[in-house]
């Protein structure tokens, strides 16, 4: 008994530690690790970066180890997300807000990596894109409350996000009936009869306008107005955290849209022009349209649309509300012509007599009582903006591969504009389908010149080597680089390599301070579970991609194997087997439900635990268990820390009752039974008629009637009581009460 208690305490302690594999963070995040770097040191670096005294201080460096690899972040203040006119409005105050806590950067020496986030009170929050996928970092107290922890932040990989509603009947966007009502309403907009000089010019000389467009800078940036309600502020706590969340969402969709070719229209980007933060103090403000706690998703979008948003490309409201049917967002769908709504739409009068701006949308970060991971919220934002850009939901086999019966296509998942929310871990989840690209390109061709602005060009002097630059060491008072011309030099010379210089340290870690490429033997990146250490190649300043370790090398604490440099294969593949799910059946030990199980290829009947006698020659009797939080029993439950499969009822009792009552199969079965047993139905009908006749006959004596020939109705209580024989009423004999009682008793 004592040993059992000690074991339980040890398991509970292990479950609470960060950095241990198999820690589920919530029902959507299956595994996380804790981070406990020095927050005071990072805060001091952040303060130095704000002042930017030297070239080195411009960059914020953060180093830590997690998920079996080293992160060496090199970041710089991100000003690309906010326009020159950016303002923050809160509680009737307009502020010229300092966004110096927003950073963007990369992993030093890892080509193609990218990071974005914020530094608040010495803690970094954001996402890091690597060759092995995207990692997310958030404050620990956002998930783990009322506990003393040895770490202050949590980090998890996108593959560990398990969003159960991604292919379910609920979750994500509104259903078809809602969009149909919205579409009909959009058709009722009354167009303004006045014509702007630009439109007159377009009508009088389209060829001239087309020529001017080709010679001038392209308008490809959509400016945003973002509002947050008091519930969103209540969840994140501070103004800095709210702006960090907005920045993270905008950067996420900016990355998706910039890398998409919309039929020749490229580099579509986003920039925040204005933010309105409704704090908890605004909850009682009568001028705050979002103050009420119980607002449906359609009404919430309508409240946003009732404001005038003519100065913006799009206007969104972020909230923390649990809308019905798992809706995460809603937006008006744009069209090239014939309908109002979408990007650049101006305020106009509609059939209900109200003026509205239909260049709007809403986003919530809560779903079915839990807060969704940032990855899901980012994809939702990209999805709703896709509606504004003119794309309806994907349909048809070409654009919904996740519904395909072909396993190869199904494995790639659905695209961004799929009707239901996705977890973002599939190949297609961050891409637009061909259907969406065709629709969006038509709307962009018609509308983007009405409100889009020119995008910011690469800036020489920001310390980051961008397109068109050979190097970038900053301005003259910051540049300590002997290899690169600083930003104060004339055009054609600044941000270029000096004569006879091979490289610049600003290009990457494989360049020396003497402007020479490092030799082929120098290390530029530490090794990981599945990749060898990075070695300079002697011909470039960037750290080349690391050579992968041999396929089927054990990784992830011997639970997986390396495939082409990524820890992505099952341990079963090492022995020519396939991973399978141990499902419960007669005679099967329920403990095996949380074991890693393998089977021979294309032979499901051979599925057995790694600890079984069948696979003893491969695993030597060693049982490999699934990680806590992993699905088990054919996805009908999840494994807890005690390696027990806990069954999950995803629908709930009310949903099951509704399905049982209104199921078409139920009525089909009843109809078949009636046809087969018609004589039983006839007997039941006769019995029911006789029962009703008897009931009427019995109750008729208690029913009042206006017929004077019928006896008066009998009272029902008197009928139900036990009757006694009638007695002659005599005056009470006070002197002999006991005798009267005895006589009555005898009569009975």
UniProtKB/Swiss-Prot annotation:
What is this protein called in UniProt?
Disintegrin and metalloproteinase domain-containing protein 10
Q: How does it assemble?
A: Forms a ternary EFNA5-EPHA3-ADAM10 complex mediating EFNA5 extracellular domain shedding by ADAM10 which regulates the EFNA5-EPHA3 complex internalization and function, the cleavage occurs in trans, with ADAM10 and its substrate being on the membranes of opposing cells. Interacts with the clathrin adapter AP2 complex subunits AP2A1, AP2A2, AP2B1, and AP2M1; this interaction facilitates ADAM10 endocytosis from the plasma membrane during long-term potentiation in hippocampal neurons.
Supply the PROSITE patterns for this chain. ADAM_MEPRO (PS50215), DISINTEGRIN_2 (PS50214), ZINC_PROTEASE (PS00142)
- Quote the catalytic activity from the record: Endopeptidase of broad specificity
Q: What is its main location?
A: membrane
The GO terms this record gives for MF are: endopeptidase activity; metal ion binding; metallodipeptidase activity; metalloendopeptidase activity; metalloendopeptidase activity involved in amyloid precursor protein catabolic process; protein homodimerization activity; protein kinase binding; SH3 domain binding
Instruction: Please list the residues that make up the active site.
Output: 384
User: Where are residues bearing Phosphothreonine located in the sequence?
Assistant: 719
Q: What class of enzyme is it?
A: hydrolase
Q: Which organism is it from?
A: Sus scrofa (Pig)
Q: Sorted alphabetically, which PANTHER family does this protein's record hold?
A: ADAM10/ADAM17 METALLOPEPTIDASE FAMILY MEMBER, DISINTEGRIN AND METALLOPROTEINASE DOMAIN-CONTAINING PROTEIN 10
């Amino acid at each position: 008994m004592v040993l059992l208690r000690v074991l339980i305490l040890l398991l509970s302690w292990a479950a609470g530690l960060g950095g241990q594999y198999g820690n589920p963070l919530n029902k959507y995040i299956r595994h996380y690790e804790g981070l406990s770097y020095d927050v005071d040191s990072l805060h001091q670096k952040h303060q130095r970066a704000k002042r930017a005294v030297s070239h080195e201080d411009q960059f914020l460096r953060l180093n830590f180890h997690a998920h079996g690899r080293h992160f060496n972040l090199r970041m710089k203040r991100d000003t690309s997300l906010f326009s020159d006119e950016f303002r923050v409005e809160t509680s009737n105050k307009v502020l010229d807000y300092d966004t110096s806590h927003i950073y963007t950067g990369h992993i030093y020496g890892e080509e193609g990596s990218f990071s974005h986030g914020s530094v608040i009170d010495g803690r970094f929050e954001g996402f890091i894109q690597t060759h092995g996928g995207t990692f997310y970092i958030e404050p620990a107290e956002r998930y783990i409350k009322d506990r003393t922890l040895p770490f202050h932040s949590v980090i998890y990989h996108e593959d560990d996000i398990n969003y159960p509603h991604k292919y379910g009947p609920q979750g994500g966007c509104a259903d078809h009936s809602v969009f149909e009502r919205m579409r009909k309403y959009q058709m009722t907009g009354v167009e303004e009869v006045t014509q702007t000089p630009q439109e007159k010019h377009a009508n009088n000389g389209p060829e001239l306008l087309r020529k001017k467009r080709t010679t001038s800078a392209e308008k490809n940036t959509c400016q945003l107005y973002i509002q947050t309600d008091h519930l969103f502020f209540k969840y994140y706590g501070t103004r800095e955290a709210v702006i960090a969340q907005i920045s993270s969402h905008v950067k996420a969709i900016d990355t998706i849209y910039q890398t998409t070719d919309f039929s020749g229209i490229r580099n579509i980007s986003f920039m925040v022009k204005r933010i309105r933060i409704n704090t908890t103090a605004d909850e009682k403000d009568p001028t705050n349209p979002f103050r009420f706690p119980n607002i449906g998703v359609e009404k919430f979008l309508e409240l946003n649309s009732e404001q005038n948003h003519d100065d913006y490309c799009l206007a969104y409201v972020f909230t923390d509300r649990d809308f019905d049917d798992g809706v995460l967002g809603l937006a008006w769908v744009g069209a090239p012509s014939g309908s109002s709504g979408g990007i650049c739409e101006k305020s106009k009068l509609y059939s209900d007599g109200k003026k509205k701006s239909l260049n709007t949308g809403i986003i919530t970060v809560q779903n079915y009582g839990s807060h969704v991971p940032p990855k899901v919220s980012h994809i939702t934002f990209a999805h709703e903006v896709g509606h504004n850009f003119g794309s309806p939901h994907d349909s048809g086999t070409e654009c919904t591969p996740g519904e395909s019966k072909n396993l190869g296509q199904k494995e790639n998942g659905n695209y961004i504009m799929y009707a239901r929310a996705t977890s973002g871990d599939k190949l297609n989840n961050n891409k637009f389908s061909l259907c969406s690209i065709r629709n969006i390109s038509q709307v962009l061709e018609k509308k983007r010149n009405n409100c889009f602005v020119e995008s910011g060009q690469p800036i020489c002097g920001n310390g980051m080597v961008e397109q068109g630059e050979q190097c970038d060491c900053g301005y003259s008072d910051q540049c300590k680089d002997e290899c690169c011309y600083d930003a104060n030099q004339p055009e054609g010379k600044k941000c270029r390599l000096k004569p006879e210089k091979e490289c610049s340290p600003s290009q990457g870690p494989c360049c020396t301070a003497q402007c020479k490429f490092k030799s082929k033997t120098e290390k530029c990146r530490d090794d990981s579970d599945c990749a060898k250490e990075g070695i300079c190649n002697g011909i470039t300043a960037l750290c080349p991609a690391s050579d992968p370790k041999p396929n089927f090398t054990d990784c992830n604490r011997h639970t997986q194997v390396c495939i082409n440099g990524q820890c992505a294969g099952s341990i079963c593949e090492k022995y020519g087997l396939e991973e399978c799910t141990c499902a419960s059946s007669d005679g099967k030990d329920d403990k095996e439900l949380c074991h890693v199980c393998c089977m021979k290829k294309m032979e499901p009947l051979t599925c057995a635990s790694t600890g079984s006698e069948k696979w003893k020659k491969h695993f030597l009797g060693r049982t490999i268990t699934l990680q806590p939080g992993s699905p088990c029993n054919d996805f009908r439950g999840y494994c807890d820390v005690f390696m027990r499969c806990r069954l999950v009822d995803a629908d709930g009792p009310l949903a099951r009752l509704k399905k049982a009552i209104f199921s078409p199969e139920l009525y089909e079965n009843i109809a078949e039974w009636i046809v087969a047993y018609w004589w039983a139905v006839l007997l039941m009908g006769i019995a029911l008629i006789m029962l009703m006749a008897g009931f009427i006959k019995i109750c008729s004596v208690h029913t009042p009637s206006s017929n004077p020939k019928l006896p008066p109705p009998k009272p029902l209580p008197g009928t139900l009581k036990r009757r006694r024989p009638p007695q002659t009423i005599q005056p009470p004999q006070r002197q002999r009460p006991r005798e009267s009682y005895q006589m009555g008793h005898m009569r009975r």
